[in-house]
């Protein structure tokens, strides 16, 4: 029923890569108007045609757009958008995947957040749902995030979206092969150099 819409989401947000199983469930739930996952995870998935946050310059004035420093930042952000595949609004700003070609292909995609200041944050876990649940665990009424995560995992399982683990300490926390924050800095410096700003 949603095959065409899922294919479009894959093309627009993931460069045609297969949509992970949990993301598929969450997308269909949003499109069906279900709010149970939204309530638990605080995610709102992008609709077709929404601009990637790293490519959005609509908030900048003409003067800012003409500024060589800002042009360097925008060019670096556009390059980063090739690797930062954001799929939803939530968390500190936006949430998605880090798909740099130098990352090992034999593991699940790294999860990341981008905040409104263009800072990159890693999420633990092997799936988007695990990463977001771990992040949300620290904002629950339960002060112990390990217990809160287990409770969230149980609620998600009841809704038909079981996590790979209910143990917070067992969540995957593998380091990036390529650090997004460092790469962004390097790209900005390279763009500054192209513009004679060094």
Name each region found by the language model.
Residues 1-101, 165-198:
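A surface-exposed partner-binding patch
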Residues 37, 65, 100-104, 115, ...:
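A generic structural signal for solvent-exposed, polar alpha-helical segments
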Residues 105-148:
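Compact, glycine/acidic-enriched structural inserts
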Residues 137-171:
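An amphipathic alpha-helical core segment
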């Amino acid at each position: 029923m949603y095959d065409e819409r899922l294919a479009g989401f894959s093309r627009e947000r993931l460069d045609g890569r297969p949509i992970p199983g949990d993301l598929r469930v969450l997308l269909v739930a949003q499109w069906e108007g279900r709010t149970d996952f939204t309530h638990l995870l605080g995610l709102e998935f992008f609709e077709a045609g929404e601009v990637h946050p790293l490519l959005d310059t609509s908030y900048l004035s003409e003067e800012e757009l003409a500024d060589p420093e800002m042009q360097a930042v925008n060019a670096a952000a556009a390059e980063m958008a090739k690797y930062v595949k954001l799929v939803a609004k939530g968390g500190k700003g936006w949430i998605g995947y880090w798909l740099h070609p130098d990352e090992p292909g034999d593991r699940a995609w790294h999860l990341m957040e981008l905040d409104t200041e263009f800072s990159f944050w890693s999420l633990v876990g092997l799936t988007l749902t695990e990463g977001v649940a771990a992040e949300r665990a620290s904002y629950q009424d339960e002060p112990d995030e390990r217990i809160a995560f287990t409770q969230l995992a149980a609620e998600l399982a009841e809704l038909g979206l079981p996590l790979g683990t209910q143990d917070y300490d067992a969540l995957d926390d593998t380091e990036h092969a390529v650090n997004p924050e460092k790469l962004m800095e390097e790209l900005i410096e390279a763009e500054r150099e192209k513009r004679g700003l060094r």
